[in-house]
Amino acid sequence: NWIVKDGYFFCLQHLGFASVYLEAKPMYADDLWWDIFNLSENKKCPTSLRGIGAFSIHAAQLKEYAFLNECAEENNEEELSKKWQNIFCLAVQDIENFLRNHPNADTFIPNKNCNYDADKLLYFITLLHNGRKNEVVQAIKELKAKGHSCQFCDWASGMDSYDFILKWCKG
């Protein structure tokens, strides 16, 4: 379940039944991400895949909603429908609050100390979009010096996401 609003991609994600997460990212994030990897053809993908596809950038986690304490099969259809309606109502309110605090997707920069993106890729993409290339290069060099590498790695070239970002920054 996702929506594009005011330059942001918002999505409700769940990997199990205990929690549902409201996530957001600027719509430009995946476009820039794919430019860095020379994968411009991905820009033609459906919006749903652009937002949460296998090679899209992680969104910022805005909110966690408790969903089910037990297995979904133990709830009837009416109970599940009510629970989802409640989540949707809460998410709409939280999206509106987020947009009041961050009305311009072009200037949004997520918390760099988040726990949902160990590689800080959305953070770096938003900095790059805002012309803060030197800050990104310095931060990535510091992370690499500490031995941190990204989850995504191109085995053929031996490069990880940080290497691709550094290469793109050199231009």
Where are these regions (language model features)?
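Intrinsically disordered, low-complexity regulatory regions enriched in serine/threonine/proline
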Residues: 4-171
